Amino acid sequence: MTKLVVGLGNPGSKYHETRHNVGFMAIDLMAKELGLTFSEEKTFKAEVASTFLNGEKVYFVKPTTFMNLSGLAVRALLAYYNIPMEDFIVIYDDLDMEVGKLRFRQKGSAGGHNGIKSIIAETGTQEFDRIKIGIGRPQKGMTVVNHVLGKFSEDDYAMILLTLDKVETALHHYLKTNDFEDTMRRYNG
């Protein structure tokens, strides 16, 4: 079996560690912990790192398409490696959740998230596993765009780092057990 774990974000140093890039941050942490390095795969429009965990090939992916076209990379990788949707998981930010809150879902709408909209449009389904990381709503007077493309405050960044550690632990559990429902029960919150 092969797994595809995708973190959403925008490429480039301008967006490094912005709220919208918590998916990239989660993937980077996982790759670092496993001693993996990313290579740019232009065919897939993504940076890809891979390893074997518990006898399964696992691809960790950061699309290089910018958020709104993330589905292009996901569709290309799923097709090339013949990975079924049940073996695909995506990690991304959610501004409707408090900063640092963690939520696992098995399916659902895009909820206004353009990266998820793109994945749904390209794969033709909402039936895929997700890990959502709360980034909170913008402060009064700030636009959503400025909020999601902005950096975390020092306090929020500290909370996000704790959440990313929890994501890493949850991903290890999921990849070991292949049981997303159990992972949801253990790590939602």
UniProtKB/Swiss-Prot annotation:
State the top-level EC class. Answer: hydrolase
Where is the catalytic site? 20 (proton acceptor)
Q: Where is this site: Discriminates between blocked and unblocked aminoacyl-tRNA?
A: 10
Compartments, as annotated in UniProt: Cytoplasm
Q: Identify the CDD domains for this entry.
A: PTH
- Supply the alphabetized keyword list: Cytoplasm, Hydrolase, RNA-binding, tRNA-binding
* Record: residues binding tRNA: 15, 66, 68, 114
Q: Which GO cellular component term is one of those annotated?
A: cytoplasm
Q: Which reaction does it catalyse?
A: an N-acyl-L-alpha-aminoacyl-tRNA + H2O = an N-acyl-L-amino acid + a tRNA + H(+)
Task: List the EC numbers from the record.
Answer: 3.1.1.29
Q: Name one GO biological process term.
A: protein quality control for misfolded or incompletely synthesized proteins
Identify the Pfam families for this entry.
Pept_tRNA_hydro
> Which InterPro entries does the record cross-reference, listed alphabetically?
Pept_tRNA_hydro (IPR001328), Pept_tRNA_hydro_CS (IPR018171), Pept_tRNA_hydro_sf (IPR036416)
- What's the family? Belongs to the PTH family.
**Assembly with partners or alone:** Monomer.
Give the protein's recorded name: Peptidyl-tRNA hydrolase
**Taxonomic source organism:** Streptococcus thermophilus (strain ATCC BAA-250 / LMG 18311)
